[in-house]
Amino acid sequence: MIEAESQMAEAASYEEQRRRQVEANKRKLEELRLHHLSAAVRESASKPSPVKQRKRKARALPGAGEDAPLRRSGRVANLPEKPKYRDEFQDFEKRIRRSYGGKRRDLSNRVYATDEQRDYAINAAQELEEELGSDYPIFVKPMLQSHVTGGFWLSLPTHFSRKYLPKRDETIRLVDEEDDEFDTLYLANKRGLSGGWRGFSIAHKLVDGDCLVFQLIQRTKFKVYIIRASSYYETDD
């Protein structure tokens, strides 16, 4: 019986020791878990959140920026605004067309010069050119149908335009022999007169075969002399 009691006591001691070992293992496991959890928390706190890295774009308030000036660098902002030559001259050409009316000349009444009339007008214009002298740049321009009917476009001599006339589109004033003035639009790239030339042509009843002498009396002003092709017949009387 004593032996049985001794065995029971040993068994109880073994169970107690085993229980204590299990509890000790549990405590170590819990400590280990807490350690890893703490490390994970520290690591996650040290890394910036992807959501935080993204910069939130400020939302513009309704109506904001409508009256605000365009932001530019100081160097660009201080530069003068470029003049809008094309817009200005388009408006100018419209005004010229309105002032002289929009109707085309009746092409059924076209006048066709004979070779004799044409030669006479050119020779008379060249004589006048010599009389006027070389104090001002000057050239002679015989009139064709395209100059005085239909298109009303007057091309100017290339060499003269390159040497004396503006390098960009500009208003050129024509002064006739009565000192009446007519504004025309000079197109630098095409080297000719556009808007306003039609009005000058109609006002002076220019026809095919007439010959004009252009004398540049100012940078953008021509004195214009007209030799009529019809004068050929007057010389025969």
From Swiss-Prot:
* SMART domains tied to this protein: B3 (SM01019)
Q: Name one Pfam family in it.
A: B3
Q: Gene3D superfamilies per the record? A: DNA-binding pseudobarrel domain
GO cellular-component term (any): nucleus
InterPro entries, sorted: B3_DNA-bd (IPR003340), DNA-bd_pseudobarrel_sf (IPR015300), REM16-like (IPR044837)
Could you tell me which residues belong to the region Disordered?
Answer: 1-23, 38-82
Q: Which cysteines are joined by disulfide bonds?
A: none
Annotated localization:
Nucleus
Q: DNA-binding region(s): which residue ranges?
A: 139-230
Q: Tell me which domain of life the UniProt entry assigns to the organism this sequence originates from.
A: Eukaryota
| Molecular functions per Gene Ontology | DNA binding
Q: What is this protein called?
A: B3 domain-containing protein Os06g0194400
Which UniProt keywords are present, listed alphabetically? DNA-binding, Nucleus, Transcription, Transcription regulation
